[in-house]
Amino acid sequence: MARVTVEDCIDKVDNRFELVLLAAHRARMISSGAQITVDRDNDKNPVVALREIADEHVGPEDLKEDLIHSLQKYTEVDEPEPEAVPMIASGDSSGGEDSDVMLDRMTEEELLAGLQGLVPPEHTDDDEG
């Protein structure tokens, strides 16, 4: 089979720069163990990637999406919108009602049980006088 050049693939991807980026990304995928969809014919990975694009075994849009995803340093995760943050901020400035905010509180029985568990001091200055 004749060698594939960029001109053979330009009808699949209009921009030559984008074609080279996509073929290089596909070649890296092949190097890392991705399944080849055409016969290798003793060709190197970039040529195999160009042949896959030319024969439309691999879609340019899929490659482009995968390339963009691989280059992203931050992947966007859908999270609930922060509606609670303005409510907390407005609660602090409205006079500080404690009824909505429940902090670490002890009941009277828990406090008495904790005090009974304390060991009294052996000797204090108040005991002598």
From Swiss-Prot:
PANTHER family documented for this protein: DNA-DIRECTED RNA POLYMERASE SUBUNIT OMEGA (PTHR34476:SF1)
Write out the GO biological process terms: DNA-templated transcription
Q: State whether it acts alone or in a complex, and with which partners, per the record.
A: The RNAP catalytic core consists of 2 alpha, 1 beta, 1 beta' and 1 omega subunit. When a sigma factor is associated with the core the holoenzyme is formed, which can initiate transcription.
Protein name per its UniProtKB record? DNA-directed RNA polymerase subunit omega
- Segments of this protein annotated with the region Disordered: 76-100
Which keywords does UniProt give here? DNA-directed RNA polymerase, Nucleotidyltransferase, Transcription, Transferase
Q: List the disulfide bonds.
A: none
Q: What reaction(s) does this enzyme catalyze?
A: RNA(n) + a ribonucleoside 5'-triphosphate = RNA(n+1) + diphosphate
Q: At the top level of its lineage, which domain of life is listed?
A: Bacteria
Homology family: Belongs to the RNA polymerase subunit omega family.
* EC number assigned by the record: 2.7.7.6
**Pfam families xrefs:** RNA_pol_Rpb6
GO molecular function per UniProt: DNA binding; DNA-directed RNA polymerase activity
What does this protein do, in the record's words?
Promotes RNA polymerase assembly. Latches the N- and C-terminal regions of the beta' subunit thereby facilitating its interaction with the beta and alpha subunits.
- Single GO cellular component term: DNA-directed RNA polymerase complex
